[in-house]
Amino acid sequence: MEERNHENTLEKDLEAVGQEAQALEERLKAAEEELKGLKDKYLRLLADFDNYRKRMEEELKAREREGVLKALRALLPVLDDLDRALEFAEASPESIRQGVRAIRDGFFRILAGLGVEEVPGEGEAFDPRYHEAVGLLPGEPGKVAKVFQRGFRMGEALVRPARVAVGEEKREEADLE
């Protein structure tokens, strides 16, 4: 009888272990399916992100092209004006000067239309954000004494710094010794 009880206990234990193993197998299968689903979702998100990145790169290139085209379309009239000026190159020096001045003024209007403005020049305070000091000249200290090359900016973005000489107080020979 004791042996039978022992067998019954073993059978119950074995049955319990079998049920537990089956439950663990079901949980493992569910976890594997969940992992597969998450992996698929991850791969789709990765592909979506890669497609998004490519679209953004293409859009950026397209906008850059549009900007260049806009600038070129705005500048082509200057080329037309230069061609017309060359046709009249035989004219008097004064008429050539007037023509070049008109072309220059038109070019500045185009730059203004593109949002470009000239960096402040002579007599203005030297600003290292917009000016490149290339020398010193007698003049008011800290002020731009002479502009060698104009600078331009578009909003706060610097297109090209102005190359300038900055004023400094004139020193006496005795001060140098």
UniProtKB/Swiss-Prot annotation:
GO terms for molecular function: adenyl-nucleotide exchange factor activity; protein homodimerization activity; protein-folding chaperone binding; unfolded protein binding. SUPFAM superfamilies: Coiled-coil domain of nucleotide exchange factor GrpE (SSF58014), Head domain of nucleotide exchange factor GrpE (SSF51064). CDD domains: GrpE (cd00446). One of its GO terms (biological process) is protein folding. It is found in: Cytoplasm. Its cofactor is K(+). Keywords: Chaperone, Cytoplasm, Stress response. InterPro entries: GrpE, GrpE_coiled_coil, GrpE_head. Disulfide bonds: none annotated. Required to stimulate the ATPase activity of DnaK. The keyword Cytoplasm applies. One of its GO terms (cellular component) is cytoplasm. Its main location: cytoplasm. It holds the Pfam family GrpE. HAMAP family: GrpE (MF_01151). Participates actively in the response to hyperosmotic and heat shock by preventing the aggregation of stress-denatured proteins, in association with DnaK and GrpE. It is the nucleotide exchange factor for DnaK and may function as a thermosensor. Unfolded proteins bind initially to DnaJ; upon interaction with the DnaJ-bound protein, DnaK hydrolyzes its bound ATP, resulting in the formation of a stable complex. GrpE releases ADP from DnaK; ATP binding to DnaK triggers the release of the substrate protein, thus completing the reaction cycle. Homodimer. Belongs to the GrpE family. PANTHER family: GRPE PROTEIN, GRPE PROTEIN HOMOLOG, MITOCHONDRIAL. This is Protein GrpE. It comes from Thermus thermophilus (strain ATCC 27634 / DSM 579 / HB8).
